[in-house]
Amino acid sequence: MKNYKIVLLSGDGIGPEISEVSKKVLKKLSRKHNFNIEIIEKLFGGIAYEKYGTPAPDETLDQCKKCDAVLLACVGDIKYDSLARELRPESGLLKLRSALGLFANIRPVKIRKSLVNTSTLKKEIVENVDLIVVRELIGGIYFGKPRGHITNTKIPKAFNTMVYDSAEIERITEIAIKIANQRNKKICSVDKSNVLEVSQLWRDTVLNITLKDKNISLSNMYVDNAAMQLVRDPSQFDVILTSNLFGDILSDLAAMLTGSIGMLPSASLNNNGPGVFEPVHGSAPDIAGKNIANPIAMLLSASMMLKIGLNEEEAAKNLETAVDKVLAEGFRTADLADGSSEVLSCSEIGDKIIDEI
């Protein structure tokens, strides 16, 4: 029997509620598929700041480095917005990514048949959407230096630097190639090479790396056009490869094709060592504690963790199938309610999914 150790970071807002559902689901899966899973819970985000004065305590980061995978719920709350930037819950995410060397963010966007009518776009536009956004995570304008404010002038200024080296682009391209080879072997690289030198390097490097794999079909698209095409004809995409800033924007745009951001998981990976698996949605403090949050994105993130992080593919498939069955039977959380479905609480839909496993 295999033994796994994961760190669970419940974080803020609805995090504890969806984490509780995830713990129950993982325990059920471990019994059914004959593996042991030790779940170590640590403070992270705003709740960690309240106790330790930092959103990412050293103890939490050290434990994350030692585990097989990290399952993260969500962080943040408007009450922390007045803190210095490095003390806000969201900065803890940057510290976690840096500590684990997580350079690749993988975000699947798939329309589940039972939810096709929840999208704000027409059914015929979204019904065949099944794409993955591969986003470079620790480079680009979010991390580039120099950066800062100039306030001792008549007109205040602020500046950031978008910078990539070819090695950073090469390694994220290799991740995209690996994923594309498991799918339809199509990559669309998104940049702004008509005006940005950094995007010119991006395009050249991606081309050079993909040419080494004759199975891969590469196309290029400017980011403004990519945003338009994701709304006009999203099913044309299979694997979208892009930089940190562009990926941040496009992945959220793609998320809303599904009708609810509460349905989408993600994974942040490195070449070796534990990855972080987390839902796309935020902490939703306005509904925290009401037991009405949608836990499915968290559960699908757990499924990605099982498949990618722990190599328990059968358990991952079992969980996804259970989710689909519950949705097909017409059960929904409030964010997915369509008037004809039965609306369940966070814990109730979790119990339904457990029953289907």
UniProtKB/Swiss-Prot annotation:
Binding-site residues, substrate: R97, R107, R135, D224
NAD found in the keyword field: yes
Lineage: Bacteria, Bacillati, Cyanobacteriota, Cyanophyceae, Synechococcales
SUPFAM superfamilies referenced in this protein's UniProt entry, alphabetically: Isocitrate/Isopropylmalate dehydrogenase-like (SSF53659)
This protein's name: 3-isopropylmalate dehydrogenase
Binding-site positions, NAD(+): G282, S283, A284, P285, D286, I287, A288, G289, K290, N291, I292, A293, N294
Record-listed E.C. numbers: 1.1.1.85
Keyword NAD part of the UniProt annotation: yes
Cofactor note: Binds 1 Mg(2+) or Mn(2+) ion per subunit.
GO biological process: L-leucine biosynthetic process
Gene coding for it: leuB
Compartments where located: Cytoplasm
Entry's Gene Ontology cellular component terms: cytosol
Organism, as annotated: Prochlorococcus marinus (strain MIT 9312)
NCBIfam families: leuB
Cofactor annotation: Mg(2+); Mn(2+)
Function: Catalyzes the oxidation of 3-carboxy-2-hydroxy-4-methylpentanoate (3-isopropylmalate) to 3-carboxy-4-methyl-2-oxopentanoate. The product decarboxylates to 4-methyl-2 oxopentanoate.
Annotated family: Belongs to the isocitrate and isopropylmalate dehydrogenases family. LeuB type 1 subfamily.
Pathway: Amino-acid biosynthesis; L-leucine biosynthesis; L-leucine from 3-methyl-2-oxobutanoate: step 3/4
